[in-house]
Amino acid sequence: MKNDLQKNWGYRPSLGRRLIRTFCKLIINVFRLNGRSKFSNEFIQMLDPKFETQFDGRDLQFRTGNGRLLWRAKTLLTEEPLMISWIKNMNPNDVVLDVGANVGMYAIPIAQRVKMVYACELDPLNIAILKENIVLNAVQDRVVVFPIACGDSMKLVDIKFRDLAYGDALQSIAGGDVLDSHLGELPHTTKNLQMSLDELFNGIDAIRPNKIKIDVDGNEETVLRGLVNLLSTANEIYFEDSFTVACKNFIIFLVELGFQEQECAEIFSKDGKSKSLGFNRIFKK
């Protein structure tokens, strides 16, 4: 098994960040800000950590509160340039399905320019932040949250989490590819509700998406089995290809449906451009 320092996916705090955390723990202990008293609870409640930015002339606010959430907000415009370009080309009549929405870093700016966004996310902690971001940006009339694991059928499944943290990613649905990632302080497994998105849309009165974003961190195979009909009726797909067999099969299926790759951008490890981890790809009919 690879040493943790050699893992490619996920976040590992730098020495500087770890020193900051040690200092913060000291302050918390000295002033007893650990939530065990009325004062500390009121103090924590009054904290309102947010990051404000602009995207294409529109104001955005994102809930922060930990290093990962702050990083997501600060790198909105630089982490995935292809995604930013894709969003800028959307129009007011588009309906977008975001499979793997996390805390809404892309669902929110998309919602500011399209008719409707369906945001799918399986991590309850991320869903809480996603809801805050939706309300902070006043797009609750254009975002519907599906708090489920997307898969091939409705059932309870085991989900492996790297950590117990807001803004985390790389969760693994039972049977999916486990990406080679850093583990946090509290890796764990819980049972979650899984649903097929095809079955979900067949059972509700909702406009079908014409654009679909898929970023599911190794869970492509089970997601695909429950997304066949929606993929067939869409005209644009934004897909994160992690160089797995499941990703390869997903792309083959898109081509069989008549999609052609229009653009791609390489994904690199977080420690710089030392290792290619895959490609973000845009497919169109």
What spans do the regions from the language model cover?
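Short, glycine/acidic-enriched loop or turn micro-motifs at the edges of active sites
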Residues: A101-V103, P124, C150-D152, V216-E220, ...
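Core alpha/beta nucleotide-donor-binding catalytic domains of modification enzymes
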Residues: K131, V135-A138, V143-D163
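Conserved active-site loop/cleft motifs that coordinate metal ions or position small ligands
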Residues: K211, E236-E240, Q262-C264
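S-adenosyl-L-methionine
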Residues: M1-R142, H182-P187, N202-A206, L257-K285
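Short internal loop-to-helix segment that lines adenine-nucleotide cofactor pockets
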Residues: K74-V95, R142-V144, L156-D158, A174-T233, ...
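S-adenosyl-L-methionine-dependent methyltransferase catalytic module, highlighting the catalytic core
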Residues: A149, R162-V178
